[in-house]
Regions:
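Short low-complexity stretches enriched in small and charged residues
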Residues: 85-87
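DNA polymerase processivity clamps
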Residues: 1-16, 20-75, 90-205
């Protein structure tokens, strides 16, 4: 199994994927620039072979017209934070949402945010989710989605970018947003092996 983790201190992405074969185990920290290049070079199909030794990692993959592409990167110094302690457990509330509807509604609400107020508010009521955003500079927007939710009303606010970006990377029709309250980290996940930990923001409402 290969586990990929990335964080900027305000959000964290975690993805597990199976590997066909491995001759050992280990871990390393890749620079952000290397990850950016890998995203451009990695084919949608085919194999990617990963080698590492000491402070270097090598990636070998198929390129255009059958050519082989090799990327060599230095590994960063230091010890990566214990990401397992960051992933929230025993979350009280799980919201099941249509990925596409949730993504598009967030993107529309995001248009009404500004640099000073880059926040969207989610209010989970009886079988519905209300997404709203407002700013002095742009205006305000509100949209309601139908969903399955029974129980007390829950309200939580996020930087919309921290939800929109992971939603764009997922293929599942349904996603799950899990939380305890408006102050604690929330977990966005799909049925596939991808999880995103997102810190909530304070809302002016």
């Amino acid at each position: 199994k290969l586990t990929l983790v990335a964080t900027d201190g305000r959000r964290m992405a975690l993805c597990d994927t199976d590997v066909e074969s491995a001759t050992g185990d280990g871990q390393g920290i890749l620079p952000a620039k290397t990850v950016s290049e890998l995203r451009k070079l990695t084919p949608l199909e085919g194999e990617v072979k990963i080698y590492w030794e000491g402070k270097k990692a090598l990636f070998r993959m198929d390129g255009p017209a059958g050519a082989e592409v090799v990327l060599i990167s230095k590994l960063m110094e230091g010890v990566y934070p214990n990401y397992k302690q960051v992933v929230p457990v025993e979350l009280k509330h799980t919201m099941t949402l249509s990925r596409e509807e949730f993504l598009h509604a967030l993107a529309r609400a995001q248009l009404m945010t500004s640099e000073r107020s880059h926040v969207v508010k989610l209010v989970f009521g009886q079988n519905q989710l209300t997404i709203s955003a407002k700013s002095m500079e742009v205006g305000e927007a509100q949209e309601t989605l139908v969903m399955n939710h029974e129980g007390p009303e829950l309200s939580i606010s996020f930087n919309p970018t921290f939800l929109v970006e992971p939603l764009k990377t997922l293929d599942d029709g349904e996603v799950f947003l899990e939380m305890n309250d408006e102050f604690s980290p929330a977990l966005l996940r799909a049925k596939e092996n991808a999880q995103f930990v997102v810190m909530p923001m304070r809302s002016s409402d």
